[in-house]
């Protein structure tokens, strides 16, 4: 399987990514195939506007119920907000994946 070369984010997360305040993304199984060491082009989901490149550092499975304050800090939000956002995007999904990255 070929690793994905593109990643999208809601535009509301762009500033935090560019500022280095958001260093992970939590995705469902359909987006678990990113490979550590690869670089992806990042664009806004709404407009498809490219705004940076990210190097994938790790991809780790996690249960929704195991999310904690450390994950929230890496997402630059409170744990309560993080869980609300994830439920909004992936309603009812328990198995998720934490993708850690750095801007290049």
Swiss-Prot record:
Keyword field contains tRNA processing: no
Reactions the enzyme catalyzes: N(4)-acetylcytidine + H2O = cytidine + acetate + H(+); N(4)-acetyl-2'-deoxycytidine + H2O = 2'-deoxycytidine + acetate + H(+); N(4)-acetylcytosine + H2O = cytosine + acetate + H(+)
Pfam families: ASCH
Stretches assigned to the ASCH domain: 7-93
UniProt xrefs under InterPro entries: AC4CH, ASCH_domain, PUA-like_sf
Keywords: Hydrolase
Similarity-based family: Belongs to the N(4)-acetylcytidine amidohydrolase family.
Name of the protein in its database record: N(4)-acetylcytidine amidohydrolase
Species of provenance: Vibrio vulnificus (strain CMCP6)
């Amino acid at each position: 399987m070929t690793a994905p070369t593109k990643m999208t984010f809601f535009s509301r997360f762009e500033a935090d990514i560019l500022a280095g305040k958001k260093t992970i993304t939590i995705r469902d199984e359909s987006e678990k195939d990113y490979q550590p060491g690869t670089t992806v082009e990042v664009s806004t989901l709404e407009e498809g506007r490219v705004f940076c490149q990210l190097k994938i550092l790790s991809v780790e499975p996690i249960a929704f119920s195991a999310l904690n304050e450390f994950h929230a800090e890496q997402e630059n939000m409170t744990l309560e907000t993080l869980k609300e956002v994830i439920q909004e995007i992936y309603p009812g999904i328990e198995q998720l994946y934490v993708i850690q990255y750095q801007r290049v």
